[in-house]
Amino acid sequence: MKVLLSALLLLLFAFEPSASGKKLSDPVLSKRMELYHKIEAVTQIPWYALAAVDQYEENVRSNRKDLPEKAGIISIYIPDDIWSGPENPNPKDDAPLSIKVFDGIGMDGDGDGKAEVSNDEDILYTFSQYLLSYGTDEDNIRIGLWNYYRRDQTVGIISEFMKLFKAYGHIDLGEHAFPLPIRTDYSYRSTWGDARGFGGRRIHEGTDIFAHYGLPVKSTCYGVVEMKGWNRFGGWRIGIRDINNTYHYFAHLNGFAKGIKTGQIVEPGQVIGSVGSSGYGPPGTAGKFPPHLHYGMYKDNGRTEWSFDPYPHLRAWERYEYQKKK
């Protein structure tokens, strides 16, 4: 009976439109797009690859205190010793010739005769030339990214951003949606940080939204499905990465929406599964607690990933959807 109810509810909500409409054009995003396309025309490095690296770096800067503030609208960070050269006596060198002599990578991108690490076009052009040394196809770009960052997680995240930007043709993908259909029977409160005992003492890394079996669970963002499957704690669960380096975790599902697979692009409001009570045991275990959606959010800062409280975000998305439907 639960399976039949789940199927009917999924069909009912599968074609619900995205909860958040397209945002008004942001002049900063528009200017970035102009720069990406300008550098692409010169270097043949795809604009969406440059945009993905820049987006990743912007996210990292916003979550790290050891990195300097960006000077312009481009966030790609190239350390002085790499820009000017490791043996360069002038770490702030902006002369292309002497930078080259000392094996720096800094280049003049706007034709003013200077290679300035604070200049948006110089930064983009320099990084594009670095990637160009590996090739213009996506596989070789990923090799170049790995040699630059030396972190598999970073390359994977940037690759997901590339997929998103390439698919949509723009970078304005910051919209969100509440994970359950509003005006249905659900309840939740702030439970992040509460104690949990199953599998050893630990804290609760999310918010539990209690609802009936089979209620559709929706993607909260534009993103890429990084993970789908069983976990002894979370049961049937899905993990989605958005363009803000935030990993959205949906657990204790009753099942997945048809066709959902890892590597797939999803949108805000798209049905990805249904509410259940799976978990706390081997595959198929269910019913050890009331049906609910465990929703978690994790942030990556280029070094590590940590959980943060999703409750304020859920409240904001819920309010926004109610306002949209007034």
UniProtKB/Swiss-Prot annotation:
Obligatory cofactor(s): Zn(2+)
Cofactor note: Binds 1 zinc ion per subunit.
Pfam families found in the cross-reference section: Peptidase_M23
UniProt signal peptide: 1-19
UniProt key word Transmembrane: no
tRNA processing keyword on record: no
Record key words, sorted: Cell cycle, Cell wall biogenesis/degradation, Differentiation, Hydrolase, Metal-binding, Metalloprotease, Protease, Signal, Sporulation, Zinc
GO MF entries: metal ion binding; metalloendopeptidase activity
Note: The presence of single L-alanine residues in the spore cortex increases the spores ability to be resistant to heat.
Name of the protein this chain belongs to: L-Ala--D-Glu endopeptidase
